[in-house]
C-alpha cells in the first residue's frame, strides 16, 4: 500500500464490519487428494476418471456445486460470481468445418458447468453471474 494511506481506527472498524459486494470464484477442475503418509505433505493426487478429460484436469461439474455450497455455508450466504470457468481440449476437439470451429467437448463442458451453477442456485446459493474463461470458451 501507499505509505500515505493510513486509515483511521474508525475507518478500519467500518472496513472490518463491512461485507464484500460479491465473492469471485474461478473454477476449472478439482484436484482430488487422498491420504498417503509416504508422500510429501502426506497426500497424493487421487485419480478421477471422467467422461472427457481436459488439459486442465478432470471434468467434474458436481465439484463446482460442492464448492459453491461450501462457500455459501462458510461465508454466511454471500453473493457469488463465477469469474472464470472453462477448459481446453486440444486438437481432438477442435474441428474446422468451413469457417466454423466445432468443439463439442468444450460446449459440453460449459453446458454441464452452467447446469451445475443452476443447481446451486436452485439450492439457494446466490450466484449472480457467470463468465467463461476466455473469448474462446
Show the residue positions of the predicted features.
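Non-catalytic scaffold segments within catalytic domains of secreted glycoside hydrolases
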Residues: 1-137
Amino acid at each position: 500500500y501507499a505509505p500515505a494511506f493510513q486509515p483511521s481506527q474508525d475507518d478500519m472498524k467500518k472496513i472490518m464490519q463491512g461485507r464484500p459486494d460479491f465473492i469471485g470464484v474461478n473454477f476449472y477442475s478439482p484436484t482430488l487428494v487422498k491420504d498417503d503418509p509416504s508422500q510429501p505433505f502426506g497426500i497424493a493426487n487421487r485419480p478421477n476418471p471422467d467422461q472427457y478429460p481436459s488439459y486442465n484436469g478432470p471434468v467434474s461439474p458436481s465439484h463446482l456445486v460442492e464448492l459453491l455450497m461450501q462457500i455459501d455455508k462458510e461465508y454466511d450466504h454471500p453473493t457469488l460470481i463465477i469469474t472464470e470457468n472453462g477448459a481446453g481440449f486440444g486438437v481432438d476437439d477442435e474441428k474446422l468445418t468451413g469457417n466454423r470451429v466445432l468443439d463439442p467437448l468444450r460446449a459440453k463442458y460449459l453446458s454441464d458447468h452452467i447446469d451445475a451453477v443452476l443447481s446451486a442456485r436452485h439450492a439457494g446459493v446466490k450466484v449472480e453471474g457467470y463468465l467463461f474463461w476466455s473469448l474462446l470458451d
